Curated annotation (Swiss-Prot):
Pfam family, one: RuBisCO_large_N
Organism from which the protein derives: Adiantum pedatum (Northern maidenhair fern)
SUPFAM superfamilies for this protein: RuBisCo, C-terminal domain, RuBisCO, large subunit, small (N-terminal) domain
Compartment annotation: Plastid, Chloroplast
Function: RuBisCO catalyzes two reactions: the carboxylation of D-ribulose 1,5-bisphosphate, the primary event in carbon dioxide fixation, as well as the oxidative fragmentation of the pentose substrate in the photorespiration process. Both reactions occur simultaneously and in competition at the same active site.
Source organism superkingdom: Eukaryota
Protein name (database record): Ribulose bisphosphate carboxylase large chain
EC number in record: 4.1.1.39
Amino acid sequence: YYTPEYKTKDTDILAAFRMTPQPGVPAEEAGAAVAAESSTGTWTTVWTDGLTSLDRYKGRCYDIEPVAGEENQYIAYVAYPLDLFEEGSVTNMLTSIVGNVFGFKALRALRLEDLRIPPAYSKTFMGPPHGIQVERDKLNKYGRPLLGCTIKPKLGLSAKNYGRAVYECLRGGLDFTKDDENVNSQPFMRWRDRFLFVAEALFKSQAETGEIKGHYLNATAGTCEEMMKRAVFARELGAPIVMHDYLTGGFTANTSLAFYCRDNGLLLHIHRAMHAVIDRQRNHGIHFRVLAKALRMSGGDHIHAGTVVGKLEGEREVTLGFVDLLRDDYIEKDRSRGIYFTQDWVSMPGVFPVASGGIHVWHMPALTEIFGDDSVLQFGGGTLGHPWGNAPGAVANRVALEACVQARNEGRD
């Protein structure tokens, strides 16, 4: 399984693993073990191996490089033949590549840093229900980032008070408000009541401002059937957008919801709750850029992508690396930004990155510069924390945003 002479094919799925072998285990052996365990291998030779062509189906570790500045850490590059994966299934792709290998005895730690998805595979996915351009056309909003706000306190408000908070924010000039990721259907606010009061807030604020407004109605639920029921109800109310927690809800549920949203003209906002459990450790887990690529394939029109400046962790260059992987069509390999492979999405629609978490108006110049126009800037406490209330907080955000955009367009600081 360690084959340094192997030339990768255009149809191979390529993976870059950061591996820390146990003391005494050579890097080549560890790399081969990763390739074997995540493809056709098992711990011993079995007679049924003779009934198939392992050469055709096995994963191959084709390169290993030591990580600069780290002791006993290596980047192992593994190529997987396309036929190992079911078409159009992120679930199957991740089950194969990261399903079993992370508990391996020969490794002290293992992290999936990046994946190269070949066009032959990405073309089997629908991708985002609508994408950046279609969303702008639906909302009739151009030439600036979109503004959002998560309604706080995230838990405990009644549906009517919740709807009022939504109305105040949208009236003040925001484009979107948002259910917090853990607002589903709790005793203090059942989902149907929330959807009804929020729809009222949407239409009232639209009538007043003459702008199209949205609220990310969280359709995440305990079963896929219940999730779809909520999405259907949101569509019947005339809401423009629903929301899903894609890691806790799962990729299968997410892809089903994305198909429904595309067929029925709903935008889909994706929250990444639970991502830090998977991506925060530097030497073990899965890097968020892989989770972001997986989401673009599974389907979503917005996804949270860190802020570079707020309360949550995120390094600037690396964050911009996966922001580009979400938005752009073709992304060159660039190790300084953590991009291990050139990725060609062959015209799959892009995803709006959402900057959210501890940001406020003072961050606006930095945010517009870092994220550019195709992004959603989401201020929770940064809107609702305004001493005069939600609507003035929303006004402050909108004014700050338009000032920054105007300054940029006129070439002023």
